[in-house]
């Protein structure tokens, strides 16, 4: 067994709210979570290999150990914007909110990731060619529209390369001025049926979808009214 490492370059702004955030607000995470990565792999498996193969492979994908190597720089743009959302109560006839959707204001954050994003998967057999094929098919991470481009074919390595952080694993040291964020992952109880958006089954935060407090090696370098600039801390 070895580590399987893939590097992606963001080709669009990244955005991914924490699992507990509401639809009208919430800060964006600075990196994709293991949960988001595994859902992207599952999506690639369903599209390229079919639902039957994806269902059979899901327990293996779900239990993967995921490590991240963040881009060297990240710039977060924050703003308020208008969106349309379903009306919970019927609006008065003739009002500007008449119809199934109403206008409201929400808070949004978008992250510009400067540099390659590394993903590593632990305890992977060199014979697992299917996982390699699915990593080739990932084209976005986080919120839909956060497009990424694979920089080179995934490679195997005996040890985890430097600058990678294992989400949910034991931590021997971390930067004192790092950024703490909650990165979610799949619990062992998350079945393929619940992971499928077509089954109607819900995924419960804190049960099938668990969070890990993770110190990201980012240091705030500069900030203003509408932006925050982070730089990766390299030991």
Can you say where each PLM-predicted feature lies in the sequence?
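N-terminal ordered "arm"
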Residues: 1-53
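Internal, well-folded beta-alpha domain core
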Residues: 49, 53-235
């Amino acid at each position: 067994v070895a580590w399987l490492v893939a590097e992606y370059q963001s080709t669009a702004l990244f955005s991914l709210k924490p699992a507990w955030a509401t639809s009208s607000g919430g800060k964006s995470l600075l990196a994709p979570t293991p949960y988001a990565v595994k859902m992207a792999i599952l999506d690639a498996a369903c599209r390229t290999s079919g639902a039957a193969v994806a269902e059979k492979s899901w327990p293996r994908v779900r239990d993967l150990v995921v490590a991240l190597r963040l881009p060297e720089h990240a710039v977060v743009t924050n703003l308020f914007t208008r969106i349309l959302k379903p009306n919970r109560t019927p609006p008065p006839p003739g009002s500007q909110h008449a119809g199934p959707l109403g206008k409201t204001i929400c808070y949004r954050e978008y992250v510009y990731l400067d540099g390659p994003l590394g993903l590593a998967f632990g305890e992977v057999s060199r014979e697992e060619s299917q996982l390699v094929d699915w990593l080739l098919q990932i084209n976005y991470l986080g919120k839909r529209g956060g497009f990424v481009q694979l920089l080179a074919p995934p490679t195997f390595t005996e040890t985890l390369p430097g600058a990678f952080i294992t989400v949910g694993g034991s931590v021997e040291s971390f930067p004192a001025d790092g950024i703490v964020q909650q990165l979610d992952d799949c619990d062992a109880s998350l079945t393929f049926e619940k992971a499928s958006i077509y089954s109607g089954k819900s995924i419960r935060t804190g049960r099938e979808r668990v969070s890990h407090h993770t110190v990201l090696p980012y240091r705030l370098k500069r900030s203003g009214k509408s932006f925050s600039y982070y730089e990766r801390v390299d030991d």
